[in-house]
């Protein structure tokens, strides 16, 4: 168990304490806010409330993925220390960062032929990615070898269900996920899009629901339909939110009411600055283990 480390990108949207307590290493994405670059470092360089307030006030954001040289600099100290590496990337349906990681792997395995680097596509995002990493840590702690854990991820990653809704369509329109016309009409009618992540790791709209109250009920209904063992679901549930904590708490309360056997309380995290640059404020995301994702 101690001959390899597990690693991911900061876009798993867990807290520093959570990463540390589970012995999960991470590397930071980058983003720009009004032309100034910052690391996506779990809100340390810029607190999340400040980031989302800036977006709400019209600040322009832009994200950039980790390049191969950064991955090499990040991976190499582990290799020098005699460790193999399992790095799980943010979904290839959202970013091409896995390509940078693969280039770094090729270069470093030439330099350290006795070491092994496994790069795996999570096909997940935000705290859904974090939920997967948490289970990966469980499997590592249970004694799985590096190769066994890689195969476990490939077999189970699509069981992580992601459901999102937003009460602010501004940034979905800007990102092209919703047309300007649909966004204008949606704003007038208080329509909240409900989205999920597909088998390809892409975020797509599934339905349009009028009013926040109804979309909160609808997202929990999706968990009722898809959670492993239905109302007897006994695993963890994570929620991510972008400057709408009360909405996230409302979802968590319904989840805890319907699923009395949850493994602990629902964990609410902030949507980080990379994912948040595309969603903007007003997004709540619900993550749980369940059936294969809706196609």
Could you tell me what each predicted segment is?
Residues 5-70:
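N-terminal glycine-rich anion-binding loop in soluble enzyme alpha/beta folds
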Residues 2-3, 11-19, 24-30, 86, ...:
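Mixed-charge interfacial surface used for oligomerization/domain docking
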Residues 70-101:
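N-terminal glycine-rich phosphate/adenylate-binding segment common to multiple enzyme folds
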Residues 58-66, 89-96, 123-124:
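Short coil/turn segments at secondary-structure boundaries
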Residues 42-45, 95, 126-127:
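Alpha-helix N-cap/helix-start motif at coil-to-helix transitions, marked by capping-box chemistry
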């Amino acid at each position: 168990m101690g001959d390899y480390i597990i690693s991911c990108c900061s876009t798993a949207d867990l807290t520093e304490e959570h990463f540390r307590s589970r012995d999960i290493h991470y590397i930071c994405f980058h983003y720009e806010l009004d032309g100034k670059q910052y690391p996506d470092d779990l809100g340390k360089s810029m607190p999340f409330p400040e980031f989302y307030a800036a977006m709400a006030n019209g600040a322009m954001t832009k994200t950039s993925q980790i390049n191969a040289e950064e991955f090499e600099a990040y991976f190499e100290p582990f290799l020098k220390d005699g460790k193999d590496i399992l790095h799980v990337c943010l979904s290839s349906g959202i970013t091409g960062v896995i390509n940078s990681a693969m280039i770094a792997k090729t270069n470093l395995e030439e330099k350290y032929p006795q070491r092994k680097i496994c790069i795996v596509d999570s096909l997940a995002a935000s705290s859904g990615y974090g939920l997967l990493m948490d289970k990966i840590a469980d499997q590592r702690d249970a004694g799985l070898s590096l190769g066994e854990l890689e195969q476990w991820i490939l077999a189970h990653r699509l069981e992580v269900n992601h459901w999102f809704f937003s009460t602010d369509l501004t940034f979905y329109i800007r990102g092209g996920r919703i047309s300007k016309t649909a966004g204008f009409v949606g704003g007038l009618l208080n329509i909240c899009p409900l989205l999920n992540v597909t088998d390809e790791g892409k975020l797509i709209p599934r339905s349009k629901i009028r009013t926040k109250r109804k979309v909160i009920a609808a997202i929990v209904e999706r968990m009722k339909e898809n959670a492993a063992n239905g109302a007897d679901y006994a695993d963890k549930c994570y929620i991510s939110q972008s400057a709408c904590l009360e909405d996230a708490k409302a979802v968590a309360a319904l989840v805890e009411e319907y699923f009395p056997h949850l493994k602990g309380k629902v964990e609410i995290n902030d949507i980080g600055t990379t994912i948040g640059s595309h969603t903007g404020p007003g997004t709540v995301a619900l993550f749980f283990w369940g059936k294969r994702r809706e196609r």
